[in-house]
Amino acid sequence: MSQALPVRDQGRDQGIFAGTLPPAPPKFKWTRLDTYTWAIIAVFALVTRFTGLSSATASGTPVFDEKHYVPQAWDMVRSWINPITGGIESNPGYGLVVHPPLAKQLEALGEWVFGYTPLGWRIMVAIFGTLTIFAIMAIARRLSGSTMVTFIAGILALADGVLLVSSRFGMLDIFLVFFITAAAWALIRDHQQMHQRLNDLLLTNGQITKDFGPRFGFRWWRFTTGVFLGLALSVKWSGLYYIAFFGLTSVFLDLWLRKRYGVRRYVTGTLKNDVIPALGSLVIIPALLYIWSWRAWFASETSVYRHAKTDGTITEDSILQLFPESIAGWIHYHISVLEFHGSLTTSSGHSHPWDSKPWAWLVSGRPILYFSSTDISCDVGGTCRRMIYLFGTPAIWWLTVPVILWALWSFFARRSRGYVVPLVAFAAGFLPWLAAYDRQMYFFYATALVPFTIIMLALACGELWGRGKMTPTGLTRGSMAVVTYISLVVMMFLAFSPLFYGFVIPDYVYESLMWFPSWR
C-alpha cells in the first residue's frame, strides 16, 4: 500500500519549540527518474513558451506595457557603450523611466541578437519563463525530497496561465519572478546546509558546547540568496519587500536551529553570530548589485538627470547640492520616480479599465486584456475573434486561499517547517500591496505569488498521496484525489488556452469562457 509523502525533514516536528534534538537533514540523491522527470517538463516548457513566440499578436504588435519596455530596451542597444556597460534609456517621448534597468538590459540582449522584432523583444522572457519552472521544481524537490512532488509542481507551473502569458511577452514581471523564486531556493539551501553543519558538530562532539553556539563561517548559499535578491531589486523596487521578508526569515531560521540544538543563549548567539553577516549578504550585496545595474547611467553623459545639479533641475537650496554631480543626479532621479509611484493613485484620478486590487488577485478575479481582434470571418459561420488575457488557470488560483490556510495550519499546529519559505515569499508579494491599496494596480503584480502557491499545492498533494482506503483502481482515495486534481488543472489549461495563446475562436466559444463579468 502506498504511503503519504511527508514534507521531508519538515513534517510533524513536535520538538520545534521544546529543544529536542532534530533528525539529520535529508539527503538528496539524484536518480534516473529525476532525470526523466526534469527532461519531460523541460520539453513541455520549451514547447509552451516558445511556440509562436514572434507571432503571438498580429505582426508581433506590442501589448500593454510592452510599448514602453520594448523601445527602452532598443535604446540600450542603440546607445551601447561597451560589452560590460551596455547602453542607456534615452527617454524619447514617454516621460520618466520608472523601473530599474536590469530587465530591459536583458531584453536588449535579445534585441541585439534578433533585432527590433517580436522575437528579439520576447526571446529573453521565454527563456526566463522556462527557468522559472525549473526554480519552482527545485524548491519543491528541496522541501519534499520527492520526485513525484517535484513532477506535480512542474505540471502545475506548466499549466498556469499567468506564468505562461508572462513568459511570452516583453514585460518585466517574469524576470522579477525568476530572481525571487531563485532567491527562495537559495535561502532553503542555506538553511539546510546550516542544519547539516550543526548536525555534524553534534555527531562529532556529542553536544553543542558553547553558550552562544558556533559560528557558521561564510555561507555561500546565503550570499547567493543576496545576489538573487539584488537582481530582483534591479528589475523592480518591489524586490525590496523580499529583501526584508527573506532577511528576517533567515535570521529566524538561524535562531530556531540554535535553540533546537540546545544552545543556551540562542537569542544572543543569533544576534552575535548571525545578524551582521546576514545584513552583509542580504542587504549590502543587493544594494551593491542594484547600484551596479545603473552602470550605464553613470557612464553616459546624456543620461536623464545625469547633470541635474548643473542644469538647474536641482535647486540651489537642495541638500543634494552637497553631493557630487553624478550622485546628486542619481538620487534626484530616484526621488522623481518615487514621487511618480506615490501619485499614481485611484483617488487622484489615475484609473484604468483593467485596474485590480490585491483581494481580487487571490482568485484571478480581474485579468488583463493584452490583445483583442474581433469581427474575424469564421468558416463555421458568424464571427470569430482573437483575444489574449493575462489570466490564471482557475483550478490553481481558486485554491490559493485554501492552500494558504492549510500551510498555516500545518506550520502552527503540526510544526511543519516545509511551508515556511513559501508562506513568507507569498506574504512578501501580497501584504505590502494592501498597505498601498489606493495605488493603481494590475493583475501582473500578482505574478510573483503563483510560484509559491504552486509549491504549497504540490507539497499538499504529496501529503495527500497514499492516504485513505484503497480503491478498485489500485490507488488510495487520497491518491485518486491528487490524480483527479492534476487532470482538472490540465483540462482547464487546455480549455482556456485560446485566451493564453490568442487562437482564433468563434464568438460563442469566447462567451462560454467568460464565466464572470469581471473577466471581461
UniProtKB/Swiss-Prot annotation:
Predominant cellular place of this UniProt entry's protein: membrane
Pathway: Protein modification; protein glycosylation
EC class name: transferase
Observed phenotype of the null mutant: Loss of protein glycosylation.
One Gene Ontology MF term: dolichyl-phosphate-mannose-protein mannosyltransferase activity
Membrane topology recorded in Swiss-Prot or TrEMBL: Multi-pass membrane protein
EC nos: 2.4.1.-
Transmembrane segments: 38-58, 119-139, 145-165, 168-188, 237-257, 274-294, 388-408, 418-438, 441-461, 485-505
Keyword terms, alphabetized: Cell membrane, Glycosyltransferase, Membrane, Transferase, Transmembrane, Transmembrane helix
One Pfam family here: PMT
Compartmental location: Cell membrane
GO CC annotation terms, alphabetical: plasma membrane
Disulphide-bonded residues: none
Family: Belongs to the glycosyltransferase 39 family.
Function recorded in the entry: Protein O-mannosyltransferase that catalyzes the transfer of a single mannose residue from a polyprenol phospho-mannosyl lipidic donor to the hydroxyl group of selected serine and threonine residues in acceptor proteins.
Protein name, as recorded: Polyprenol-phosphate-mannose--protein mannosyltransferase
Native organism: Corynebacterium glutamicum (strain ATCC 13032 / DSM 20300 / JCM 1318 / BCRC 11384 / CCUG 27702 / LMG 3730 / NBRC 12168 / NCIMB 10025 / NRRL B-2784 / 534)
